[in-house]
């Protein structure tokens, strides 16, 4: 395997030479440079969470995520890296040595390792290629009470309902077509994590959830206890949509999507702390504002167009605030906004 030296954040590390392989997917060890933002944001989150943490990344690839955690967050006490590929394991060891980082490296099936680590991890980060569904039960079993579960899903087309049968088979949910389909996909993922957590007697409290062009990501505090798990399930429901109107309902019909997480997607205080490090601050400030709005959907400007024309997003937000409606832009759509109001209230103000 031909290697080159790469740099991400504060870490130098070896990766398979991209000039040697047709794509990152054909390389013997997987490294996705487009996930750098994901890893950087995860480092910021860990900085706010604690210190001396036992962190497990069961799908490590080159090991860059775990190594960045160890070097940049100052929060890691024990680092556990794993990959089912022997070539990946050798590369992980090489990268740990290059950076002077101590870590335990395993060559196991991810689920097997997570079962062996039962109740020992403060942080479990599931970052697969594709769906995280096959790993979540074992991830919760490895987690300690009040641990942090982090989950990435790159099967976004499935989560937003583009492939209905696969969505139902994989996530046991039904997603209808709506203008706010990105938020439905994100809430679909968080809802699935919550249901798996409850089956393992955990509740979840999302602290940081978002969408990027090719993936969904959620990180949540997990609290052990049957009663807590039952309470967590109260945050599940269905979102009904018809002719621009939206509402939360408790049953599935031809106009509703779910089951979905209808509670908060994140903690504004946590994201505010993350934004203080000066990295991706504008993005994090947008999330902070979004998390403060309870409505589990967003609106898009074309929904309020008259004769094919609608005001700019900035003007729309200004008009709504003047009308006494709390509203903010969303990171999930370039022409979208979230508001503590229904469609008719917004349309009335914009038509004045």
Curated annotation (Swiss-Prot):
CDD domains: AdoMet_MTases. The keyword Transcription regulation does not apply. SUPFAM superfamilies: S-adenosyl-L-methionine-dependent methyltransferases. The keyword Metal-binding does not apply. GO terms for biological process: tRNA N2-guanine methylation. Coiled coil: none annotated. Residues 4-350 form the Trm1 methyltransferase domain. Its EC number is 2.1.1.216. InterPro entries: SAM-dependent_MTases_sf (IPR029063), Trm1 (IPR002905), TRM1_arc_bac (IPR022923), tRNA_met_Trm1_C (IPR042296). It catalyses: guanosine(26) in tRNA + 2 S-adenosyl-L-methionine = N(2)-dimethylguanosine(26) in tRNA + 2 S-adenosyl-L-homocysteine + 2 H(+). Keywords: Methyltransferase, RNA-binding, S-adenosyl-L-methionine, Transferase, tRNA processing, tRNA-binding. GO terms for molecular function: tRNA (guanine(26)-N2)-dimethyltransferase activity; tRNA binding. It is an enzyme of class 2 (transferase). S-adenosyl-L-methionine binds at residues 39, 65, 83, 109-110. Dimethylates a single guanine residue at position 26 of a number of tRNAs using S-adenosyl-L-methionine as donor of the methyl groups. Belongs to the class I-like SAM-binding methyltransferase superfamily. Trm1 family. HAMAP family: tRNA_dimethyltr_TRM1 (MF_00290). This is tRNA (guanine(26)-N(2))-dimethyltransferase. It comes from Pyrobaculum islandicum (strain DSM 4184 / JCM 9189 / GEO3).
